[in-house]
Amino acid sequence: MEDFRVRHECSSLRGTLLDSRYAKAVQCLVEEVIDIGGREVELCNNILINQLFPGRRRPGFALSSEIKSELCSSGFMSLPENHEIHIKITKLLSLLQQVEERFEQYCNQLEQVISSFEEIAGEGSSKVYTGLALQAMTRHFGSLEEAIISQLNSVRRRFIISHQDVPKIISSGLSQLSLFDGNTTSSSLQRLGLVQGPQRHAWKPIRGLPETSVAILRAWLFQHFLHPYPNEAEKLVLASQTGLSKNQVSNWFINARVRLWKPMIEEMYREEFGDSLDESMQREANDDSN
């Protein structure tokens, strides 16, 4: 009985606040005094989702079924010698479907929380709090999707190396997958390896890595300056973003740590500690020589 009375009083108070003619004016006044970027968060969130998933409100919206349909229609899944790869692709598609379902579940739960919150605080009042959370989770789930797509492409590449007559896969479902940098669909698919780019003449050697690929790797290095070497999953994502192989990515970071990262660290220490560092290094050198 006491619990019912408390709920009734809360409901009455909520109704009184929402019906008050001063509620809107107070809300506007509070927004002017305490502006934490609600409109900017909403705009940024909408732009982010449109860039990540053009034409789709959420990541993974039936993407696994689209990929499976394209693989089947291309004849890739029906090749008789393709049994082991078929099993791997099936597992990856199942994992991708789970990511889709989990994100759909997250969005539904978030919508329920938003609805409950806005019943009390007013329509649109939750955007400030949920916008950044939705951005973060969209990026997380999008990264998982991208890693799974990269694995699918890796399996396909290995099979194509041993079976050169395999039909090429051009997926309309995959064409909707963006790589967080706002580039065109064509360049995104080329980085994933799902569409062949311009063919390079066999007699023309490659002098170093492409500048665009190096720029992506260098940006990652500076973003993770304290831990400048990617793990296995991060290598796969970087490989898909740059169009390089996993070994090329690994070798670049090994060289970059020696040629770029280590000299920068030493320079930073010199600027911070000055002559004391040089003296310490000189003593260590003398100790080693002795």
Swiss-Prot record:
Q: Where is this region: SR/KY domain?
A: 20-36
- Superkingdom of the organism of origin: Eukaryota
Q: Say if the entry is tagged with keyword DNA-binding.
A: yes
Alphabetical list of Pfam families matching this protein: Homeobox_KN, POX
Region called BELL domain, residue ranges: 81-152
Sorted UniProt keywords: DNA-binding, Homeobox, Nucleus, Transcription, Transcription regulation
Q: Which Gene3D superfamilies match?
A: Homeodomain-like
Q: Which InterPro entries match?
A: HD, Homeodomain-like_sf, KN_HD, POX_dom, TALE_homeobox
Q: Which PANTHER family does the record cross-reference, listed alphabetically?
A: HOMEOBOX PROTEIN TRANSCRIPTION FACTORS
Q: What's in the domain note? A: The SR/KY and BELL domains are responsive for the interaction between the TALE/BELL proteins and the TALE/KNOX proteins.
The family assignment reads: Belongs to the TALE/BELL homeobox family.
How does the annotation summarize its subunit structure?
Answer: May form heterodimeric complexes with TALE/KNOX proteins.
Could you identify this protein by its name?
A: BEL1-like homeodomain protein 11
Organism, by scientific name, is Arabidopsis thaliana
Taxonomy, top ranks, is:
Eukaryota, Viridiplantae, Streptophyta, Embryophyta, Tracheophyta
Gene from which the chain derives:
BLH11
